[in-house]
Amino acid sequence: MTARRTRWTRRTDRSLPIRSAAAAVAFAAGATACSAPTGGGGDGGTEAAESVVIGVASEPDTLSPLLGYGKDGNSKIFDGLLARDTDLELKPALAAALPKVTDDGRTITFTLREGVNFSDGEPLTAGDVYTYRTVLDEKTNNTARSELDAVRERSARADGTVVFTLKYPYAPFAARTVLPIVPEHVAGKQDPNTGDFNTEPVGTGPYVLTGWSKGEKLGFRANPHYWGDKPAVKSFTMAVTADDNVRATRLRSGDLDGAVLPPNLAATFEKDDGRRTYRARSYDFRAVTLPSAGQVTGDRAIRRALDAAVDRQAMVDKILDGAGRPAYGPLPVDDPWYERGIERPRDLAAAGRILDEAGWKPGSGGIRARDGQRASFTLYYPSGDKVRQDHALAYASDAKKAGIEVKVEGATWEVIEPRMKTDAVLADLGSVGDPDFGLYTLLHSTLAGDGFNNMAHYANPAVDEALDAGRRSQDPKVRAAAYREIQKALVADPGYTFLTHIDHLYVLADRWDGLTTQLEGRTNTASPAGPGGTSRTGGRKK
C-alpha cells in the first residue's frame, strides 16, 4: 500500500478521526494489506504470522461487483478506476491519473494504467469497463443502480481511454468510480445474476479467493499478478461468526487472530498482554426504521415523540462505553456537511405534549392509545448482534416512559426482511464521502422498499426535491443549502429515530505491528463481511 500510514489509536488513547463504514472489512483490510507481522509474536513467529484469521459477523451473498460487492472501493479482490487513501482523498488505481473533466462536468475521461493483469493473467482493457453498463442494466439485480443515475453512456477506446458522458453534472461522480472493474472475458459470458462469477471472482486486486464455505469462512491468498505493492500477509481467512460472544470466545482461545467486537466484549481484552484493542471513528450509525405503512410507526406524532424521548447520550455512555457520538441525523456531528443546531437533548415533557396534541391519550399500563389503537409496535434486530440488541432494549425503555410500547424481538434476516415494510428494524447504516451517497438511498421516496434502500418508506416531497438538487448541482452553496434543508426536515418530520454514531473497536494479536487504516467507505452496504464486500446483494446494508 502506497498511501500514508496512519496508526490506528489504542482504545485508551485519543482517537483519530478515522472514518470507516464497515468495521470488519476495514479491520481485515488493514490487518492483511498493510501490516507487517513481527517475529516476536505468538507461536510460530513471522512465518505463522504471514497468514491470519479474522472473525467477522456475516458473509456476502455474492462476490460480484455487478451485484454490488465492493462498490465503495473496499474490495481486496478488485480495483476501481480510482481508490481512496487514508485521508479519504481520491487517488488513481486502475486509472493512470485522476480524470479529465470537460463539457461543464458532463464528460469524464480516464486513461487506464498500463501493465495491469487480472488474476487469471489476462490484461486489463478499456472494454472491461463494461462493468458500468451491466450494473445499469435493469435486468441486473443491483439495487445500487440509482447511484449511477447520472451516467448516460460509457465508451471505450483501443488506446485505453474510457469516457463517461453524464446526463447532468454530478459533482461526486469521480468518487463513484471506485466501483470495482470485472473482466469482460470472464463475467461478460455469464448471466450476472446467476453465473459462477458470483462465487468464483477474477479481479485485479491484491488477493484472490481460494475457497468459500458458506456460513463458515472465506479464504484468500496474495495475487501473484497484482500490479501494486505486494501485501505483507500472504494469506488470510475471514471466519464467519455471527454471535458476538462466540466471536470473543474464539478470539480468546486463539482460534482467531483478530475480531471486531462490541465495547463490553472488547473491554475484556484490555489487560491482555498478547492483544491490542484499537478504536476508529466511523460513519456507521444505529437507527430505528419507522415504516410509513405501520399503523403506529407511520404516525408523525409517534415518530416525533420517539425522537424527543430517546436518550442518545446515555446510549453512547452505557452501551458504547463512550466509543461513539449521539446521532441527530444520518451525518455525524463532526462531518463538514453536518447542520449545526439540530442537536436536541432528551425531552420527555415535549414527547408527552406531542402525543397529547395528536390525540394519543394515556391508557392501560401507561401505554397511550387513540381510537382504540394502542401505541405499540414490534422492533426487530438481528440475533447475535449485541450492540443492536442493547440499542433496541434502551430504545424500548425510553419509549415506554413516553407511553409507547416497543416489543423487541431478535430474529434472523430471513425472518426480518419480509416484515421490513410494516415493522421497525434496528438498522446499521452509514455512508462515507459525499452526502449524496448515503442520504439519497436512505430517504428518496422513489427508492422506498427497493432492497434495503429507504427502509422506512419515507416520503417527503421537499426532501426529495432537496436530494435531487444536491445530486444535480455543482454549486457548493446550492448543495450545502440542500443538505441543510434535509437535516432540518428530518427533525420536523422524522422517518427514522437516529440513535448513535459508533466507533469501531478491533482486537488484534499483538504480533501485528504497524496496523494502518484502510478505508472501506461503503454507502448503505450491508453488515460487514469479507474483504471489502457488502453482505447482501445489491450493496445493501441493514
UniProtKB/Swiss-Prot annotation:
Protein name: Protein XP55
Residue positions of covalent lipid attachment, annotated as S-diacylglycerol cysteine: C34
Lipidated residue numbers (N-palmitoyl cysteine): C34
Name of one Pfam family that matches: SBP_bac_5
Membrane-topology annotation of the record: Lipid-anchor
Entry keyword Lyase: no
Localization (cell): Cell membrane
Similarity comment text for this entry: Belongs to the bacterial solute-binding protein 5 family.
Biological function: Required for transport of an unidentified substrate.
Gene Ontology MF, one: peptide transmembrane transporter activity
Sorted UniProt keywords: Cell membrane, Lipoprotein, Membrane, Palmitate, Signal, Transport
GO cellular component term of the entry, any: periplasmic space
Matching InterPro entries: Peptide/Ni-bd, SBP_5, SBP_5_CS, SBP_5_dom
A biological process term (GO) from this entry: peptide transport
Organism: Streptomyces lividans
Signal peptide: 1-33
Primary location: membrane
Residue numbers spanned by region Disordered: 519-542
Lineage of the species this protein comes from: Bacteria, Bacillati, Actinomycetota, Actinomycetes, Kitasatosporales
Residues annotated as transmembrane: none
